[in-house]
C-alpha cells in the first residue's frame, strides 16, 4: 500500500527544490572553488615495500630508508610551521611591576601554565633537529664509506638528501628570525625559576641547552656543517646531490614551484656545507666534479627564492659566507645587474603566447570531449591527452613561479622615497616592500598572469575526470608496453650474453610491474632462453586497463631501470656499457617520461600546488620584524620600543592594514584605474585569499591564521562591493547623462573646441553584474544582489539630490529637476538590464515623500516658491509669454531662505564633472525667466493631483486673502478719495483740457502714497496668480493632446489616409485597422482577459478618448471661484439713481480702476522705472479679471478716463505739456494698455462662456426709453422710474 502524502508535505517538498543550485549562464571570471570532497591519497610512503619481494633487495632496503627519512621530513615540516606561525605570547601576559606585588605568584603560575605547552614544542624541536642531523649524517657516512663510494645511488635518494639539506636551511633561518620564540621562552624560564618548577638537574640542564640553542644564531647550520666535516669524502656525495639538483633544474625535472625553489636552495646551502678547510669548492670545479658556471647562471636568473612563507633568501648569500669564496668564479652573481626575475614585463609576452596556444588547444579538446562520446579511446589519443595535461601543469607551475619569484625579489628589495616619489618618507618596511614597490604596469601584469593561472586551473579542473582517466590509461599502456615488449630485447641479450646482473634487474622490473593478460608470464617466451622469436613472431597481447601503478611500484621500476643506465653501478664498469644503444635510449626515454607519472596520477593535488599563490598574503616574517608595532615618528635610528625617548606615537597591532596586503593592492588597483581590459579579472586577486585560507587550514593548520584571513576578506569584500557599486553607478550615470545631453549642444561644443568626454568607455561591468555565486572562503556570494542593494541606495541618493537641488533653487530649477529625473530614469533603465532594481516611479515617490501624503516635496516647494518669490517678485510679459524677475523688490515679505543641497560626488548629479558643466550651461538659459518650458515641466512633475493642490492653495491662501483683505481695504479707502462725480468732458475742450480735467479731479488718487507700491504689488500678486493658473492649464492641455496622439494607434484611431483618384478611403482605412489590430488594447483584452480586465480597459479607453472632448476647463472654475470672493458691496457700489447705470458717479470698481489706469498711464521721467518694469502685466490682468467678474467690462470700456482722452486726442491730434505730462507720450501709453486690456478681456470671455456676464454669447436685452436732460425731467411726465413703473403695472 502506497504511503499517502498530504498537500502540506508535497508543498514543503517542492519548496525544498528552491535550495538546489542549478547551472546557469554565469560568465566564468573567477578561480576554481575549493570543494569539500574526499580525496584518496595512494602514496603509501613505501609501507607496501615488502610486497615486492621479487625486486632487488638493495632497492627494497633503500625504500625502507626512504620511508624513515620521509617521516623525518614530515616532522621537520611541522616544526617549520610551528616556528613560522609562532606569535609572541609574552607580550599578552601581564608582568609583575615589582617584587612586592601581591599577585606576583599568581601571575607567574598562570604564565607557566600558559607557556608550558609551547615550551614543550620548542624542546621537541631541539630534540628533533638533533635526531634529524644524526639521521642525515648517518646516511651520509654510510654512503661515503670506502666500500660504498662507487655504489649506485638513485636520483630519488639523492633528492631526499637534498630535501634534508633544504629542511636544515629553512629551520635554521626560521629559528634565527623568530625573536618572539626567545622572548616567550625567557618569560617562561623566569617564571619557572621563581616558582622552582625546574628543580632537578636534568630539567635544568635541558632548559639551559634549549636557551643556548635558541640564542645561538645559525646553530643548526653550523652543527650540520661540523658533523659533515668529520665524515671522510662527504663532499663527493654532496657534489652528487648538488649536481642532480643542477641537472633537474636545467632540464625542468620538477613540476611544482616549491620543488623548483628547493633545488636552488639545495645548490646554495649544499655548496656552503661542502666548502671547508678540507674541501675547496673552487678546486672541485676545476676537477669538473661540480660546474660553478652553471650554478652561477642559475643564481643570477633566480636571485631570490622563497624560503618559507614570506621569508625570502638569496642562495648566493650562502656562497658569500663560504670559506673559499672567490667572486671571480661567480661573475654573474657578483655583478650589480638586476636579475631577470625582477622584471615581469620580460616574461609577459611569452606567457601570453603560451597561454593563447594552450587555451586554444584545450578548448578544442574540451569541445571534442563534450560533443563526441568514445568508450575506449586509442593509445595515441590517451597519450595526447596525458601530454596535454602535463603541459598544462608545467605552464601553470612556470607562471606561478614567475609570480612568486617576483614577489620574493620585491620583498627582499623594498623601495624608498628616492626610487618612488609616491612612497612617503615614513612608510613602513612592509609597506615599502608591497604597496609602493610595484609600478602600475607591474600590477596589471601580475593581475593578468594570476588571471591566466586561475582561469586555466578552472578549465583543467572542469575536465579533471576525463584527463585523469586518459592519464591512467596512458600510464598503464606505456608501462606495460615497455615492460612486456620493449624490455624483451635487452632481456634476450642479457640471457644470451650471460649478463646475470642485468638479467636479474630486468626480470625484477617485469615481475614487479608486469600485468600479464593471463595473470602470469608466458612460459614459452623465447626471450627467457635468450633465443630469437620465431619467423611469425611471438605475439604478446598487452591488456588495457584504467589503473596506474602504485607509488612504491613506480619507485621500484624507475630505480631499478636507473641502475641500468647510471654512471655508477657498484662495479668496475657501468652496466650501461653492456646494453645496446637503442635499448639504452628506450630505457632512458622511459625513465625521463615516467618521472612525471607520480604527479599526473595525483592530478588534483598537483594542479592545486601548481596554482598555489597563498604566500602572497602571508606576512609572519614582517610582523615578527615590526613586533606588531608602527612607529609613527621617532627621530633616532635604532631598534624602536616603548622606551624610546623621541617616540611620538607607537601603535600596537596584530596585523597590517589591508592597504599593504597584496591581494587587496591588486584588486584595488583595478578599481582605481578602471582599466576596461582588467575589469573582468577583478575577482582573481581576491582568490588569493582562498589560497591563503586553504593553506592555513591544510598546511599550517592554524585557526588564528584562517580567522585573520577571514577578517581581512570581510573588510576587503565590503570595500570591493562598495567601490565596485560606486563605479558601476557612476559609469551608467555618466552614460545616461551622455545619452540625454542635447546633441546639437554637444556638436556646438566640439566646434568651439570644448571637448569633454561625453560617452564613457565600455568598462565590461556586464560580466561582473552577472555573477550570482562568487566563491570566497567557502561562501557562495550573490554579487549581483549586493551590487543591486547598493545601487538601489545610490539611485535613491541621486533622486534625493535632484529634489534637494530643486529645493535649494527658485522656481526656474523645475526644468533642471525634470532633466535630472529623466537622466536618472535612463540610468535606471540601463542598469535594470542586469540588476533587479526597485521601481523607478516608486523611488521618485519615496524621495519625494509622496508615498502616502497627498503632495510631495516638489509640490510643496513649487507652492513655497510661488507664494514667497514668484507671485510677488516676477513680472509677466504677454509678448514673450514669460515671467521675469522684477528690478525692484516691492514685496513686504522677507526674502525666501533656501537650504543648500548637500555636497555629493559629481556622478550623483549628471555623471561627471564635464557633464555637470555642460548641463549647467544648458540649463542656465532657463534660469532668467519662467515660461512655457517651466510650466510644461510643472505639469509633468506635479501631475493632476499636484496641480489641483497648488491651484487650490493659491486660491485659498493667496487670492482670497488678497481680494478680501488688502485689496478690499485699499478699494474702500480709495473710493472715499475718488471724486463723487467725474464726467466725460466734451470734445470741444480738446485733449489738453480733458487731461487737465482728469488731472484735477484725480489728484488725490495720483498722489496717494501707497498706490504705486503696496496697492499695485497686491494687484500684481493677484494678477500673477491668475496668469499662472491660465498658463498651467494651457501647458496641461498640450500635454494631454500629446498623450491622445500617442494613444491613438492603440485605440483604433488613425489619421485619414491619402487616397488616389480611384481609391476608396473606406477600404484603405479597413486595411489600416486590420494591419494594427494586434495593437488594439480593448479588443485584445476582451478576447484574452477576464471580464474585470475588459471593463478596466474600456473605462481607461473612454477616459483617454473623452478627457479633452468634454471641454473641461480648470481656468473657468478658478474664475468662478474668484468671482465668489467678490461679494462685498464696495465692488459694485450702490444702485444707480437712474436705475440703469452709473454714468458720472464714481461708485463702482471700474471707475476706481480707470483712476488707477490714469495713474500708471502717466509717463515717467527718464531715470524712473515704468509700471511695466516694476509690476509687469499681472497688474493689468488683476484689474481686468475683477472688472469682467463684476460684469463691468462694457461700462469700463465706454466710460474709462484714459480711453476718453485717447478718443479726444485722436480727433484733435494735439501734443502739449499739461502740468508736466507730455500728452502724446501719455496717449501712446494709453493705446498700448487699451490693446492689452482688450486681449485680456477676450481671453477671459472665451473661458467664461456659460455665465450671465456682459460678454456672454446669449445677450439678455432690456429696452429703456432714451434718457432726458435733467432740465426737462421735472416738466415732463414721459419718463418714469422703471421700478415705480413695474409696481404700477403689477398693481
UniProtKB/Swiss-Prot annotation:
Gene null: resulting phenotype: Flies display pupal lethality with defects in axon growth, branching and pathfinding, synaptic length and organization of the neuromuscular junction. They also display defects in cell morphology with cells exhibiting a starfish-like shape with multiple slender cell extensions and loss of actin filaments at the cell periphery. RNAi-mediated knockdown in gamma-aminobutyric acid (GABA)ergic neurons, or specifically in the anterior paired lateral (APL) neurons or in the antennal lobe local interneurons (LNs), results in feeding-dependent socialization defects.
Cellular localization per UniProt: Cytoplasm
Biased composition (Polar residues): 1271-1291
Signal sequence residues: none
InterPro entries, sorted: CYRIA/CYRIB_Rac1-bd, Cytoplasmic_FMR1-int
Residue spans crossing the bilayer: none
One GO CC term on file: SCAR complex
UniProt region (Disordered), positions on chain: 1270-1291
Summary of the tissues where the protein is detected: In the embryo, expressed mainly in the gut and in the developing central nervous system where high levels of expression are found in the CNS neuropile. Expression in the gut diminishes as development proceeds (at protein level). In the adult, expressed specifically in the nervous system.
Pfam families: CYRIA-B_Rac1-bd, FragX_IP
A molecular function (GO) term: small GTPase binding
GO BP term (any one): chaeta development
Entry keyword set: Cell shape, Cytoplasm, Developmental protein, Differentiation, Neurogenesis
Coiled coil feature spans: none
Function: Plays a role in guidance and morphology of central and peripheral axons and in synaptic morphology. Also required for formation of cell membrane protrusions and for bristle development. Plays a role in regulating mitochondrial activity, energy metabolism and membrane potential which maintains normal gamma-aminobutyric acid (GABA) signaling and ensures normal social behavior.
Subunit structure: Interacts with Fmr1 and Rac1. Component of the WAVE complex composed of Hem/Kette, Scar/Wave and Cyfip where it binds through its C-terminus directly to Hem.
Entry similarity comment: Belongs to the CYFIP family.
Protein name in the entry: Cytoplasmic FMR1-interacting protein
Species in which this protein is naturally found: Drosophila melanogaster (Fruit fly)
